[in-house]
């Protein structure tokens, strides 16, 4: 079985790295079993670094914990610099466009998100060459 390529948005990364959200378990299991690979680019990684420095609900991460989260991300994800060439729909939130670009540019199977605008985009457009799904919906695709 070949592995599927995945893109995670920043909030899903936070669920994995900071919040230990059990909802991300299907994605973690697919990666651990070698059924999925996660890709990230410099733009998405920069956003993750920035957000790790914000107060996150009841967590404020000190520099050591931020560094550990980033190292875990870099251990799990493959850093890829991409050039996307296909025409993509425009997100309502311009900050989310980078995730569509990364998914398209890396020929990902799925963009995994809980962002309502991205999920609505997937429902209201002609099919994209990748799925935009929640972590729970991802488990149904496997």
Regions flagged by a language model, labelled:
Residues 27, 99-100:
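Short, hydrophobic alpha-helical packing/hinge segments within bilobed ligand-binding/sensory domains
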Residues 15-16, 86-92:
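Short, flexible loop segments at the rims of nucleotide/cofactor-binding pockets, characterized by
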Residues 89, 93, 97, 104-110, ...:
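Acidic, PIN/NYN-like endoribonuclease modules and their adjacent C-terminal/linker elements
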Residues 30-86:
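PIN-domain endoribonuclease scaffold, especially VapC-family toxins
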Residues 13-14, 46-47, 118-120:
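Short, active-site-adjacent cap segments at secondary-structure transitions
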Residues 1-40:
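Short, well-structured N-terminal submotif of metal-dependent ribonuclease cores
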Residues 42-43, 114-116:
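Short secondary-structure boundary segments
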């Amino acid at each position: 079985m070949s592995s599927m390529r995945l893109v995670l948005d920043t909030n899903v990364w936070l669920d994995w790295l900071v919040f230990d959200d059990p909802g991300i378990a299907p994605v973690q299991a697919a990666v651990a079993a070698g059924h999925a690979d996660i890709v990230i680019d410099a733009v998405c990684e920069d956003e993750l670094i920035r957000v790790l420095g914000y107060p996150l609900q009841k967590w404020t991460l000190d520099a050591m914990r931020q560094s550990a989260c980033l190292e875990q991300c870099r251990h799990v994800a493959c850093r890829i610099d991409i050039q996307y060439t296909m025409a993509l729909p425009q997100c309502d939130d311009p900050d989310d466009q980078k995730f569509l670009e990364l998914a398209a540019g890396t020929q990902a199977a799925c963009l995994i998100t809980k962002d309502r605008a991205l999920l609505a985009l997937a429902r209201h457009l002609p099919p994209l060459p990748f799925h935009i799904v929640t972590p729970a919906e991802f488990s149904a695709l496997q």
